[in-house]
Amino acid sequence: HHLTANTQSIPHFSTTLNAGSSARKRRSLYLRWGKGSNKIIACVGEGATSVPYQSAEKNDSLYSSTLVKREFPPGFWKDDLIDSLTSSHKVAASDEKRIETLISEIKNMFRCMGYGETNPSAYDTAWVARIPALDGSDNPHFPETVEWILQNQLKDGSWGEGFYFLAYDRILATLACIITLTLWRTGETQVHKGIEFFRTQAGKMEDEADSHRPSGFEIVFPAMLKEAKILGLDLPYDLPFLKQIIEKREAKLKRIPTDVLYALPTTLLYSLEGLQEIVDWQKIMKLQSKDGSFLSSPASTAAVFMRTGNKKCLDFLNFVLKKFGNHVPCHYPLDLFERLWAVDTVERLGIDRHFKEEIKDALDYVYSHWDERGIGWARENPVPDIDDTAMGLRILRLHGYNVSSDVLKTFRDENGEFFCFLGQTQRGVTDMLNVNRCSHVSFPGETIMEEAKLCTERYLRNALENVDAFDKWAFKKNIRGEVEYALKYTWHKSMPRLEARSYIENYGPNDAWLGKTVYRMPYISNEKYLELAKLDFNKLQSIHQTELQDLRRWWKSSGFSKLNFTRERVTEIYFSSASFMFEPEFSKCREVYTKASIFTLIFDDLYDAHGSLDDLKLFSEAVKRWDLSLLERMPQEMKICFLGFYNTFNEIAEEVHKRQGRDMLGHIQNVWEILLAAYTKEAEWSKTKYVPSFDEYIENASVSITLGTIVLISTLFIGEVLTDHVLSKINHGSRFLHLMGLTGRLVNDTKTYQAERGQGEEASAIQCYMKDHPEISEEEALNHVYNVMENALQELNKEFVNNKEVPPNCRRLVFNTARIMQLFYMQGDGLTLSHDMEIKDHVKTCLFIPIA
């Protein structure tokens, strides 16, 4: 109903009088126009109070005498658009069943995780197939591997991963297979086809970027080429490009100090089959892994076994073949890699809530093998890499495990640069991206994280400028899109629903990695993850659309659309809650979060647009006393605000009582009283042109930013009964809530202080700091505020991770409320000017546009 002159139909409010008492009687409160008079009648039950009202048509000074009308951009989202969101996007019953099936199948994937699922490596299988029978007969010890080679040649005559064509990979695998078949004098047809493939395709390697080159290629390929020549295989040995590769190998071998090869484990252990002429086999055995392998490489381990007859090498190969049957992968195990990347994948796709137990089991496993020097792709891998280590550090830390950022020092050189392996200069886009993502989850004083952030940002931005940039370690569907998102929406600006939407579009179910050969990880990249992510996203979006429609109807029926002094931002505000508390079970939490946020916005505009401090103090007193009798003395617009507020929070208080098992209206009143006191103080500052000190300003402004008010009410709906002790850990006196308010206030001020100064508002973090330090410039003050904010965000990280006295969902609510402010004020005032900023695009993708 609309509040319009000369009509009987006016906003109707259902209210509770004396809601704090045990009686909790429900009565009807509403406004109506008195017939033939300029009075509004507030009716409570059978009684009514007449309040004089001057029509705006008869008195143009309505706003000048009470409220100063401020010009705001109109709401961007029109009713017809919101109303058009129909059930056509709702998940059908068949899709609900499919979701259940996919969840069950993915749970089973996690339960089946052992040492790592991966595809065959023709290259490594060829090396294992070379091993002669231990009884001295002229037969292979693993004849099943020879048979696998014979049966798995591709149609073009090559061997290798069939889904991806990489000339380096195919040529390497094909050369290994034709040598093995020649050694066993079998597969003449296959050898002939393989040689033909080599002759016609070898030149393509020259056209591929160096970053496409498999790990250790320049070591193992020339060595095998030399062996092929001895065997008399008809290959184009005189190709200039092949000669260049041989020269690179010779140059690299000269750079390898002999003492380094045997002093400590390095990635050279991964390619010992290509170093046979220089290896001291007795010395190299000191670097054998506990599982009997050499850096988890079947090819390297097979070469060592053929040279030494070491039983542990053979045990490892038997172990791998027992798992895979008649072939081997390019490295194994991959247990840490598989678990970390699977967890990261379901989290980024936004489906992790379905797999909480499975994720905990996976991370418990990783943590049990965590090493302060870093980790590799397998639990007993002696050579840690920055990719697995950074991924582990970030995920384990965010899940509450005690891990130190000092682990990254293993991978930093004397120039402050970060590399994938200790003592090497190799790095790729995906490993630097993982280090960058990790660096944002920093705690105060962790300089190594800041160094990692600067180094990786520089590297990744340079990679984006290079059109031909290709990742060293992975074949990703859209690695460029992943990097662009990560650099633009860093950890404190990336909301879960937005990241899920982006990653669903960038995720490749057929993504592969590049080690010594191309390999795939089916428990990391598969169609099931993607299908579930799409269905789940659309299901949640449908729920959110219905909730948004209800909230907009509430806004209109409450009469707020007639308040000309405030902003209508129902859709943007609802988006702010749905972007992180998106699960179905938090529906009421989202509703309360949105309604509380709307009232803070109305009150903010009310107190900013004041004409009389007495009116504002009256309003604050009415909230404090929860007293309807003060309605008579309020201006008309203030009356609508108070009645809508009064009734809404009486209803909320009743729902809180059901959920928390006690009457908490007093708690709710107190939360609002604290906020309105902060508003009043700011109004007094504004009217007197007072500029407080920086500390005085922050003490008040970290409350007036309203985030604490919103959180302290909506946290009562997270599904847990909260004790007074828990509430004390997130009240306005707590460090956690202060940091949330502080970071929110500072990011707001950095983007709005100039515009507000133009409107006569003198107090901001920047202006107050300049008052304390008159010798500095505005730019210096702004930089100081940014530094304070960044330090506070690091403290907030630590509170979020380590404050175990606060339930996880409470922590999540506080932390993500701080993050949503960083997103909204990324470009400017994203709430007031949302129609001109990317916020409107985020709203569309999160709430309106389903995923096909």
From Swiss-Prot:
Binding-site list for Mg(2+) 1: D604, D608
Where is it localised?
Plastid, Chloroplast
Motif DDXXD motif per UniProt: ranges: 604-608
List, in alphabetical order, the GO biological process terms annotated in this UniProt record: diterpenoid biosynthetic process
Could you list this entry's UniProt keywords, alphabetically sorted. Answer: Chloroplast, Isomerase, Lyase, Magnesium, Metal-binding, Multifunctional enzyme, Plastid, Transit peptide
Record-listed substrate binding positions = K252, K472
Q: Which domain of life is it from?
A: Eukaryota
- Which pathway does this chain act in? Terpene metabolism; oleoresin biosynthesis
| Span(s) of short sequence motif DXDD motif | 385-388
* A GO molecular-function annotation: terpene synthase activity
Key word Flavoprotein present: no
Q: What is its EC number?
A: 4.2.3.44, 5.5.1.12
The similarity comment for this entry is: Belongs to the terpene synthase family. Tpsd subfamily.
Say what the protein does. Answer: Involved in defensive oleoresin formation in conifers in response to insect attack or other injury. Involved in diterpene (C20) olefins biosynthesis. Bifunctional enzyme that catalyzes two sequential cyclizations of geranylgeranyl diphosphate (GGPP) to isopimara-7,15-diene.
Q: Could you tell me what this protein is called?
A: Bifunctional isopimaradiene synthase, chloroplastic
**Protein species of origin:** Abies balsamea
What phylogenetic lineage does the species belong to?
Answer: Eukaryota, Viridiplantae, Streptophyta, Embryophyta, Tracheophyta
Which gene specifies this protein's sequence? TPS-ISO
